């Protein structure tokens, strides 16, 4: 595994990352990390690599777009001095075109999304894992 002993792994993104994390910083164990994939990854790392003492932090904010991340990157990422950053963003960049079509300035067009991701990459000193929006196909057996 590439994550070394005692390293800090910071997750940042939108509601997919946030998932009801503690404020102002989601860290520690269990509920403080939220109820989603960050908590699951922390539990996995603790179970499989307990000797590594990996410090997991959740800085996700529901409703955020890549534009919001650019604005809060310094305070929520750089100031935390992580060794690794896991970024999951883009759902709301697209969704704002549909949930508030009468307010087009809330949407983040693809060219701005790319520009924002490049800006975040340039501002990041830590090793980075990028997650972009993914498509979930509905389960045909769901009611």
What spans do the regions from the language model cover?
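Short glycine-rich His-centered loop
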Residues: 2-32
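Alpha-helical cap/lid subdomain in secreted, periplasmic
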Residues: 2-5, 40-55, 64-143
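A structural signal for the hydrophobic beta-strands that form the central parallel beta-sheet
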Residues: 11-12, 58, 130
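Contiguous hydrophobic segments
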Residues: 15, 26, 37, 142-143
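Glycine-/proline-rich flexible loop or hinge segments
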Residues: 25-26, 55-57
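Short catalytic helix/loop segments, enriched in acidic residues and glycine
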Residues: 26-48
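Conserved active-site regions of diverse hydrolases
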Residues: 61
């Amino acid at each position: 595994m590439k994550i070394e002993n005692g390293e800090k792994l910071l997750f940042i993104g939108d509601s997919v990352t946030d998932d009801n994390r503690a404020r102002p910083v989601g860290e520690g164990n269990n509920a403080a990390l939220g109820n989603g994939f960050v908590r699951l990854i922390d539990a996995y790392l603790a179970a499989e690599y307990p000797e590594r003492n990996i410090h997991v932090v959740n800085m996700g904010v529901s409703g955020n777009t890549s534009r919001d991340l650019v604005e809060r990157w310094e305070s929520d990422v750089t100031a935390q001095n992580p060794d690794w950053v896991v970024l999951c963003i883009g759902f709301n960049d697209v969704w704002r075109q549909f949930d508030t079509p009468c307010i087009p300035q809330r949407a983040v067009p693809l060219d701005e999304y790319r520009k924002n991701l490049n800006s975040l990459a340039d501002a990041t000193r830590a090793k980075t894992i990028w997650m972009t929006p993914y498509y979930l196909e509905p389960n045909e057996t769901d009611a």
